[in-house]
């Protein structure tokens, strides 16, 4: 939900491209939630919803990317460990592997954005997100 809210904040600030990127990311995440829920049900598991840890919303786009990158790094590391434990369940492994690839792509985008900001400056980069 955070990505959707952040996207709406960025759009309201006039950064339409950046806002859409995070709203689209939220929608992708919901697609993954559906796939994992379906798999849990297929395996006879019980679906639970546990509230997510609260995260502050950040109005500065660059600061948000930096904070999100740290969360992405930890998440990708965790997904690698999860993949290792799923080697005997090829169907779930394939879903997790595809999810990991999607999350890595997001991580690389964040890293690339921060590298670009370093090269051309924050104001110039923000202008590209209008």
Task: Write out the residue ranges for each language-model feature.
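Iron-associated oxidoreductase/ferritin-like identity signal
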Residues: 1-130
């Amino acid at each position: 939900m955070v990505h959707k809210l952040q996207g709406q904040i960025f759009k309201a600030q006039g950064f339409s491209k950046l806002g859409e990127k995070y709203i689209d990311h939220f929608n992708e995440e919901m697609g993954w939630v559906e796939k994992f829920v379906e798999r849990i049900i297929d395996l006879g598991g019980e679906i639970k919803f546990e509230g997510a840890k609260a995260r502050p919303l950040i109005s500065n786009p660059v600061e948000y990317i930096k904070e999100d990158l740290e969360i992405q790094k930890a998440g990708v590391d965790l997904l690698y460990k999860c993949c290792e434990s799923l080697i005997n369940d090829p169907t779930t492994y394939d879903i997790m592997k595809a999810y990991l690839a999607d999350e890595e792509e997001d991580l690389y985008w964040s890293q690339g954005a921060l590298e670009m900001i370093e090269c051309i400056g924050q104001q110039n980069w923000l202008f590209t997100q209008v």
